[in-house]
């Protein structure tokens, strides 16, 4: 849902530069964010926009944008937790920086990035006890990997593959799992704050709302 909110705005601005598109993505994903991972994704997009320095981006520029994305997302979260989308973003950024100077072409470069992202995602199952108990990887991290895989697919084919929704009923069976998780707040509340004051102590504000 978060990405869907951004797709419409990007589609209307296809002739814009990479920098312009990243700015549109940052704004659209923030306003359309759904859930914790959606909000973090919007901060990743914000970081990408901050990390890009011009209308075009070479591999080192892309790597810098990835790093800026991870750094921005970590700073935006009051209590960053490893084994989540944050870990996948950080380790993907580290991989991008590593491969940026290897003389690869665009497809090879992004293949390395996607492979690294998938490896990072696989490890999330063994970092968070809740994920290990359930036998699953982090959902937000998986979403980020899917976005990167989509970018790679477009680089390879130059085409966007539209996925049609299935109207065929499908019966599935699943075994319920009793997962014991120490979750204090079992719901997600989101709100946007329009800041009119010019000089605001952001850290003081965060410490105040953190109580609630």
Go through the PLM ranges and name each one:
Residues 1-212:
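N-terminal loops that bind phosphate or other acidic moieties
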């Amino acid at each position: 849902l978060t990405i869907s909110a951004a797709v419409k705005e990007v589609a209307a601005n296809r002739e814009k530069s990479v920098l312009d598109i990243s700015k549109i993505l940052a704004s659209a994903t923030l306003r359309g964010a759904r859930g914790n991972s959606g909000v973090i994704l919007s901060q990743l997009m914000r970081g990408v926009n901050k990390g890009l320095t011009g209308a075009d981006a070479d591999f080192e520029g892309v790597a810098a944008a990835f790093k800026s994305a991870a750094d921005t997302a970590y700073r935006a979260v009051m209590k960053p937790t490893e084994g989540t989308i944050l870990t996948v973003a950080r380790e993907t950024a580290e991989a991008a920086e590593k491969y940026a100077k290897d003389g690869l072409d665009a497809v090879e470069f992004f293949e390395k990035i996607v492979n690294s992202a998938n490896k990072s995602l696989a490890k999330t199952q063994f970092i968070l006890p809740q994920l290990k108990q359930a036998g699953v990887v982090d959902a937000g991290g998986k979403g980020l990997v899917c976005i990167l895989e989509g970018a790679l697919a477009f680089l390879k084919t130059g085409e966007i593959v539209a996925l049609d929704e299935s109207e065929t009923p499908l019966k599935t069976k699943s075994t319920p799992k009793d997962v014991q998780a120490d979750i204090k707040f079992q719901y997600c509340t989101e709100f946007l704050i329009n800041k009119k004051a010019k000089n605001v102590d952001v850290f003081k504000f965060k410490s105040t709302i953190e109580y609630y």
